[in-house]
Regions:
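Short, low-complexity disordered leader/linker segments with a strong preference
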Residues: 1-27, 94
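Structural motif corresponding to the C-terminal cap of alpha-helices
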Residues: 12-15, 57-60, 120, 171
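Signal peptide-proximal N-terminal region
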Residues: 20-23, 47-73
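Extracytoplasmic "Venus flytrap"
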Residues: 23, 29-52, 77-82, 105, ...
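Extended hydrophobic secondary-structure segments that form protein cores and membrane-embedded regions
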Residues: 70-78, 129-133
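Short, well-structured alpha-helical segments in soluble
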Residues: 75, 79-98, 118, 165-169
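Extracytoplasmic ligand/sensor domains, especially the bilobed periplasmic-binding protein
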Residues: 98-190
Length: 190
């Protein structure tokens, strides 16, 4: 009887001190141009995100109601093209990504907003959030405003307003010329 009691005590103690299994990571998906003309910008963003994810994970991850969760970052090359970005988004969602990261193209961001809105409406169990770190076309938070899209940068109208506020008081400035790109960002600042 003593042996049985001792064995139960050891087993019970071991169960008490056993670590609970780690919660699954929060999956981040970078959907960015990582090849072609946009490769340098996309790779720079990826390096910065790797650094940030490592820092968060070294500190124990992200606090959630269920407990701390680590971050896991995956990369998807959209080749700077909208259709490729939509394919990459589908692949990221199929891989159970919960957070989509993109920012180096406003036209890609606009397409992602539409696709994410449709996806989240159809599949509430696998909703994703879009974190936009640099696509600055005002349409993204005006006409295409979405509860699933969060922009961390000032949009082009805000930037131009700030620039004009400074320039109007600078008496040394006599003329200003804008050589803008022929796409949404260039049109927004013109």
């Amino acid at each position: 009887m003593r042996t049985l009691a001792l064995a139960l005590l050891v087993v019970g103690s071991t169960a008490l001190f056993a670590q609970t299994p780690a919660l699954p990571p929060i999956k981040l998906a970078l959907v960015e141009g990582l090849s072609g003309g946009n490769a340098n910008g996309g790779e720079a963003v990826f390096r910065n995100l790797v650094w940030a994810v490592e820092r968060v994970n070294e500190r124990g991850g992200v606090a959630t109601p269920a407990g701390a969760r680590k971050l896991a970052l995956a990369r998807y090359d959209n080749k700077g093209q909208t259709e490729e970005a939509l394919s990459a988004l589908r692949a990221a969602i199929d891989d159970d990504a919960q957070v989509i990261l993109q920012g180096n193209s406003s036209s890609v961001a606009a397409a992602l907003i539409d696709a994410i809105n449709k996806h989240n409406e159809r599949d509430a169990a696998k909703r994703v959030v879009f974190l936009n770190y640099s696509a600055v076309d005002p349409i993204l938070t005006n006409e295409k405003c979405s509860p699933w899209h969060f922009r961390f940068d000032a949009h082009a109208d805000m930037r131009m307003t700030a620039l004009m506020d400074v320039l109007k008081d600078d008496k040394a400035v006599k003329s200003i010329y804008i050589i803008g790109q022929d796409y949404s960002f260039g049109h927004a600042v013109a």
